[in-house]
Swiss-Prot record:
Protein name in the entry: Bis(5'-nucleosyl)-tetraphosphatase, symmetrical
Biological role stated in the UniProt entry: Hydrolyzes diadenosine 5',5'''-P1,P4-tetraphosphate to yield ADP.
Gene: apaH
A Pfam family assignment: Metallophos
Region (Disordered): 271-292
Organism: Xylella fastidiosa (strain 9a5c)
Comp. bias (Basic residues): 277-292
PANTHER family: CYTOCHROME C5, PTHR40942
HAMAP family: ApaH
NCBIfam families cross-referenced by the UniProt entry: apaH, PRK00166.1
GO molecular function, one term: bis(5'-nucleosyl)-tetraphosphatase (symmetrical) activity
Catalytic activity: P(1),P(4)-bis(5'-adenosyl) tetraphosphate + H2O = 2 ADP + 2 H(+)
EC numbers for this chain: 3.6.1.41
Entry-linked InterPro entries: ApaH, Calcineurin-like_PHP_ApaH, Metallo-depent_PP-like
Length: 292
């Protein structure tokens, strides 16, 4: 049995299929961990979503910011829905949309497997959040998303503020938790997120740090695998394994086997487009699997 964590798919269906062939995925014994952002930009979001849905008995999904945006679009008026990009509109108008989107809404914001010592989150954790605290806070939002009043959450989750504080309540608290778990790249030691800084480390605003390098951050008892930050590139450092390698931007789609002591890496080429972006060299290289 193998457990493979897979970076942001973003509607890159063909690349996803090639990657599953590359790792010789066997649904009878293997498990896939999808790091979120299954949809948007890749042009085949409906096909990608259907594929992951078909693998639901053999996979775990955490929601990314694009997945949450899709769910929010689905509860808007038809007039507003017509304004979204064609890739997402195909999902909204699909015959099986209710079945697929209900399944998507029931997914987690954080997944933990303490038997192998790993946590999966789309973006990151606030500096003072232990893994136990992050699980608890994620569960708060998941309960709302899975409940009867989920539309209220989807309507109120947008906005860059407030910054996280334990004293927050209501929609402000939920929004702050969602922003940390699905949107964060850089933050201050106090946990204030920068939504403007999206480039490689060294290009950010003064006083901002990559979330996994913030001074004074708590020690964590689990290894973490995440996606979201394509300009960071493959980065393995201090128990953090960032595997969004920009498949939708002409980069690669990455899978990382996490149930063995020696990490194994598999990659396939993503979309054949050029997108101006910086690269970031991994600080520790995982063992490479065969490439296609």
């Amino acid at each position: 049995m193998s457990i493979w964590a897979i970076g942001d798919l973003q509607g890159c269906y063909d690349a996803t299929q090639r990657l599953l062939e590359n790792i010789r995925f066997d649904p009878s014994q293997d498990t896939l961990w999808f790091c979120g952002d299954l949809v948007n930009r890749g042009g085949q979001s409906l096909e990608t979503l259907r594929l992951v849905y078909s693998l639901r008995s053999h996979s775990v999904v955490v929601l990314g910011n694009h997945d949450l945006s899709l769910l929010a679009i689905a509860v808007r008026s038809e007039e507003e829905q017509r304004k979204v990009n064609p890739d997402l509109l195909r999902i909204i108008t699909a015959e099986d949309r209710d079945e697929i989107l209900t399944w998507l809404r029931m997914q987690k914001l954080i997944h933990v497997d303490r038997t192998i010592g790993w946590m999966m989150v789309h973006a990151g954790l606030a500096p003072k959040w232990t893994t136990q605290m992050a699980e608890k806070l994620a569960h708060e939002v998941e309960q709302q998303l899975h409940g009867a009043d989920y539309r209220n959450l989807l309507h109120s989750m947008y906005g860059d503020k407030p910054e996280w504080s334990p004293a927050l309540s209501g929609c402000n608290r939920s929004r702050a938790i969602i922003n940390v778990l699905t949107r964060m790249r850089y933050c201050t030691p106090r946990g204030r997120i920068s939504t403007e800084d999206k480039g490689t480390p060294g290009t950010q605003t003064q006083g901002m740090y990559p979330w996994f390098e913030v001074p004074g951050r708590v020690e964590r008892d689990l290894k973490i695998v995440c996606g979201h930050w394509s300009t960071l590139g493959l980065t393995i450092t201090q128990g953090i394994h960032a595997i969004d390698t920009g498949a939708v931007w002409g980069g690669k789609l990455t899978a990382l086997q996490i149930d063995t002591d020696e990490l194994r890496l598999a990659q396939v080429h993503g979309l054949s487009i050029e997108h101006p972006r910086h690269t970031h060299t991994p600080r520790r290289q995982a063992k490479k699997h065969s490439k296609k």
